[in-house]
Amino acid sequence: MPAPQIVRVIDLETTGAAPPTHAVCEIGWQDVALGSDGRWALTGEGGSTLVNPGRPIPPVTMAVHHILDEHVADAPWWHDVARPILDPWPRRVALAAHRASFEAQFCTPALTHGADWICTWKCALRLWPESPGFSNQMLRYWRRPEGMEHERGLPAHRAFPDAYVTAFHLRDMLNLASVEQLIAWSKVPGLLPRVRYGPYRGREWSEIDDDALAAFLTDRDEDIRFTAEHEYARRQGGGAIGRESRQQQLL
């Protein structure tokens, strides 16, 4: 019997931005599986567990997820809970998260058995570029995914509700593109549909002049640089005109 095709969505709540200064205080998960009908759907109940981060939770992050030090004082340690959640049996074909680079900092290859990651933020840029925004919750209310239980996806910024919401985005992405395609998009910087700042803010990249585009080619943000390079290549005869764009090649 072939192994089941399952992707596990992960969401973390932490004490701050990155290890080793900061640590996990909650992990949530929700599986999405390929059915016998060839369609992807949420499967299982998912879940979450609090984690003792081994350090105080700063007020600035308490204000986001509302997890207090006393909530995690008797919780298990990260090294005791991470591996069974991140590398369960049967093995998942990939892990997924919204802005997966954040989760991947804490969910190291040693804990995930080297699993590939799908970043639903990067994939949303490709599949739904017309969205007014690309946060997990913006996509939730702009797309209104079929079958989502509103209350089950609340409160926002807690690990299971966020994983549950992300799983609906992932389900719909997998019904539009392959696992391999989503992983490929996730391994390169985000392809932004609109300019983020400056006098052209909110405009499509094809609308800005050559001088403005040239300035973005050396931007500090890798997503902006990548997108500017993509648009520059299009204007030089690549992209939608002439050679295939990187996005078309991936498709």
What does each model-found stretch correspond to?
Residues 2-9, 20-67, 87-203:
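Metal-dependent phosphoesterase core characteristic of DEDDh/y 3'-5' exonuclease domains
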Residues 1, 168-251:
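Acidic two-metal-ion nuclease catalytic site recognized across multiple nuclease folds
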Residues 74-89:
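A short, well-structured juxtamembrane/interface segment
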Residues 15:
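Conserved Rossmann-like nucleotide-cofactor binding loop
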Residues 78, 95, 146, 222-223:
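A general structural signal for well-ordered secondary-structure junctions
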Residues 55, 59, 79-80, 118, ...:
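Generic alpha-helical secondary structure signal
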